[in-house]
């Protein structure tokens, strides 16, 4: 494709021509308050609208379905990040934990400390899927590494910096080609986590 779908600083979805830099209207029409955008493995587009839950569109911009607290079991309408794992759509919400949508059945699974007291926080900022893990960034509770049936939490380490984050409020997560997880923090710089050694490097 010669175009990228982008969300501009006015929270509008636009098409960016990667060769010319020209920005034009997207197939989604005039939509406002768009916060995050994700294309899944089936070619569908998932768009979160701030305070309005999430909507799913086909590649022509036709609305397929929508999920919010009024028409579904979604636990919170503020969706900050969207990703996919095994055909399920994972949503990071600001106050409702992680919501997992199974598109084929429209079922929604909730991961929050309301549902499970062992889940550290309900305000989730970011998600990153890596191999058999889902990395979950949580407000003031660090990063949670979730495998199927197993959860590990990494928080700020006071005495041994290499064993924990430099700041326990992650803002973004990214995986590099070597499988390391890079974590942007709110006040602690950038952290790099190596899942093989379970050690952190702070920058």
Language-model segments: residues:
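Carboxylate-rich, polar loop motifs that coordinate divalent cations or form catalytic acidic clusters
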Residues: 1-203
């Amino acid at each position: 494709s010669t175009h990228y779908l982008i969300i501009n600083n006015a929270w509008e979805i636009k098409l960016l021509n990667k060769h010319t830099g020209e920005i034009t209207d997207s197939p989604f029409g005039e939509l406002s308050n768009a916060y995050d955008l994700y294309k899944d493995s089936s070619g569908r587009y998932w768009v979160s609208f701030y305070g309005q839950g999430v909507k799913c569109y086909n590649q022509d911009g036709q609305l397929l379905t929508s999920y919010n607290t009024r028409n579904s079991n979604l636990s919170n309408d503020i969706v900050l990040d969207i990703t996919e794992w095994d055909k399920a759509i994972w949503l990071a919400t600001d106050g409702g934990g992680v919501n997992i949508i199974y598109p084929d059945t429209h079922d929604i699974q909730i991961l929050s400390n309301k549902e499970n007291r062992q889940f550290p926080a309900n305000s989730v900022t970011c998600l990153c899927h890596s191999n058999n893990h889902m990395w979950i960034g949580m407000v003031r509770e660090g990063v949670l590494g979730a495998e199927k049936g197993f959860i590990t939490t990494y928080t700020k380490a006071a005495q041994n910096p290499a064993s924990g984050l430099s700041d326990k409020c992650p803002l973004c997560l990214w995986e590099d080609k070597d499988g390391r997880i890079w974590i942007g923090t709110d006040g602690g710089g950038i952290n790099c986590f190596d899942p093989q050694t379970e050690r952190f490097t702070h920058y």
